[in-house]
Curated annotation (Swiss-Prot):
This is Undecaprenyl-diphosphatase. GO terms for molecular function: undecaprenyl-diphosphatase activity. The lineage of its organism: Bacteria, Bacillati, Actinomycetota, Actinomycetes, Mycobacteriales. It catalyses: di-trans,octa-cis-undecaprenyl diphosphate + H2O = di-trans,octa-cis-undecaprenyl phosphate + phosphate + H(+). The chain crosses the membrane at residues 1-21, 39-59, 84-104, 115-135, 159-179, 188-208, 222-242, 253-273. It comes from the Bacteria. Its EC number is 3.6.1.27.
Length: 276
């Protein structure tokens, strides 16, 4: 893997990880269009560590408060407040993607990154996002989260295992269908992703150096630089996206997803672009 590839792909990762457009799908498309090869699921997972570090820093106060309340609540019932419950909701919501990720890890690394599937997922899931925007009541606050919400949003996060769907798109859409305010759904989805993405990145770290049968390998310095770039760009993307959601809908991203999906399908159909 060249340094140009590392820089471009890590910028793409940082820009798209928190937007409902699928970072893994964009990495697969960018790799094929500009570098004629897929960066691979392992490189994607490791660069996601950078963007998750951005989440940890951006939500540091929230995370610290949740962890403190969770441990206090375990020892004393009087400390079982909304943050204590939110800690449990994150734990419970993480279980589904942990199970599905382990069961289908081989499919995720290979066939699921086929650009026909990526482009189709971009288009099809845009309909889901649009429906969530249209039908979601958007009245519930974070204090009104329930166990049912954590399970449903956690199951929705599993859809992100397929490149082209989008983790934030899936979790925010689920939250909107459940009546959560748009920015509340986004914040909960970002918190929910932290355990899963950190575990996936650390688990994939060895394969990023020496991938077996998929993608390009990267050196240690390249992975460090990629992670740092993804962190910086990702931090800026989080700040912008959360402000954007306060006064804007996700219909903008729906249109973008459809256009990108159609363009990729056209390039694949005409033979300009290879599927894998």
């Amino acid at each position: 893997m060249s340094w140009l590839q590392v820089i471009v792909l890590s910028i793409v990762q940082g820009l798209t990880e928190f937007l409902p457009v699928s970072s893994s799908g964009h990495l697969a498309i960018t790799s094929q269009v500009f570098f004629d090869d897929d960066a691979g699921a392992s490189f994607t997972a490791v660069t996601q560590l950078g963007t998750e570090f951005a989440v940890l820093i951006y939500f540091a106060k929230d995370i610290g408060r949740i962890i403190k309340s969770w441990f206090l609540g375990l020892r004393a019932p009087e400390h079982r407040d909304a943050d204590y419950r939110l800690g449990w909701f994150v734990i419970v919501g993480t279980i589904p993607i942990g199970v599905f990720g382990l069961l289908f890890k081989d499919e995720i690394r290979t066939g699921a990154r086929n650009l026909w599937l990526v482009a189709t997922a971009l288009i099809v899931f845009s309909v889901v996002i649009a429906a969530a925007e249209y039908y979601g009541r958007q009245v519930r606050q974070v204090e009104q989260l329930t166990w049912r919400d954590s399970v449903i949003v956690g199951l929705a996060q599993c859809l992100a295992l397929m490149p082209g769907v989008s983790r934030s798109g899936a979790t925010i859409s689920a939250g909107l269908f459940l009546g959560l305010k748009r920015e509340v759904a986004a914040r909960f989805g970002f918190l929910l992703a932290i355990p899963a993405v950190l575990a996936s990145g650390l688990f994939s770290l060895p394969d990023a150096f020496h991938p077996v049968g998929e993608g390009m390998s990267a050196s240690g310095p390249q992975l460090i630089v990629a992670t740092v770039i993804a962190f910086v760009v990702g931090f800026a993307a989080i700040a912008w996206f959360l402000k954007f959601l306060v006064s804007h809908s996700m219909y903008w991203f729906v249109g973008y997803r459809v256009v990108l999906g159609v363009v990729v399908l056209a390039l694949l159909g005409t033979g300009v672009l290879a599927a894998q």
